[in-house]
Amino acid sequence: MTDMSAAYVEAFLEMMSAERGAAANTLQSYERDLEDARSFLRSRGTGLTDASADDLRSYLSHLAGQGFKASSQARRLSALRQFYKFLYAEGLRTDDPTGILDAPKKARTLPKTLSIEDVTRLIGQAEAEAKSGSDDVMAKLRMHALIELLYATGMRVSELVSLPASVLAQNGRFLIIRGKGNKERLVPLSQAAIRAMRAYGEALQEESADSPWLFPSNGKSGHLPRQVFARDLKSLAARAGIRVAAISPHVLRHAFASHLLANGADLRAVQELLGHSDISTTQIYTHVLEERLHDLVQNHHPLAKQAKKQD
């Protein structure tokens, strides 16, 4: 970036990191989005720090014309809102041009998920391979632990792969997860997840006792990259006879939430377990609640029972 935009964006990113605990991925996303907006505005002879509300509307219209989904437009507008709020708070602008902009309307698509039967097959495949004693047993123990932990807790894949090795010492029925914004939450573990983690942990102590990560690797981060886990998960799904296109770590997170709600869990409790700061994010799962209520009425309402008998 040129002129003062570079310095202001750098100061903004430093603030987001130091004061709000933004993760590296979040900071990179902000930087990319602000750079894209700056490039568009520069082509119109306007600087990023001097843009008006009309300039920013033109930018959003440009994104729509380029075929960006409403969710992608909304994400970039969110980055701009944060940036201009920072400039206003620091006295670097006398106004916030994003204050009068409407957010692009996002379609509330239902998340992909897996049936309980498919999850059972997936976990069963991972468990069988971990117990087979064949080659590369460490990788198979790791995959079994990853799958059990993900489905037991519903944590984000970034939270899963970056778990510290110290969780092995907790030796309890709960796991402390450090999520977005450095916020911590407590999630319960299933007995199956505890067993899988212990089996993997014992093997890990023999192979990588000095690593600070539960799932260490030789990569830059020091822990298993989420892309590697996603790739290995698809391979496992193929061996389990599950459609590869239907599987990803995020789909398992959705399965965790959907299966809990389908079996009577409270929406607020699921919100806490998922680490959603706003209940509206969790409300995308309300279709599960609607199906459960429909089944409840059909199976237990006296008139519905009577109609079934007549059929």
From Swiss-Prot:
The cellular location(s) given in this protein's UniProt record come to:
Cytoplasm
GO MF: DNA binding; tyrosine-based site-specific recombinase activity
Question: Which residues are catalytic?
Answer: 156, 180, 250, 253, 276, 285 (o-(3'-phospho-dna)-tyrosine intermediate)
Carries keyword DNA-binding? yes
Decide whether keyword Calcium is in the record.
Answer: no
Instruction: Fill in the subunit field for this protein.
Output: Forms a cyclic heterotetrameric complex composed of two molecules of XerC and two molecules of XerD.
Task of the protein? Site-specific tyrosine recombinase, which acts by catalyzing the cutting and rejoining of the recombining DNA molecules. The XerC-XerD complex is essential to convert dimers of the bacterial chromosome into monomers to permit their segregation at cell division. It also contributes to the segregational stability of plasmids.
Q: Which family does it belong to?
A: Belongs to the 'phage' integrase family. XerD subfamily.
**Record protein name field:** Tyrosine recombinase XerD
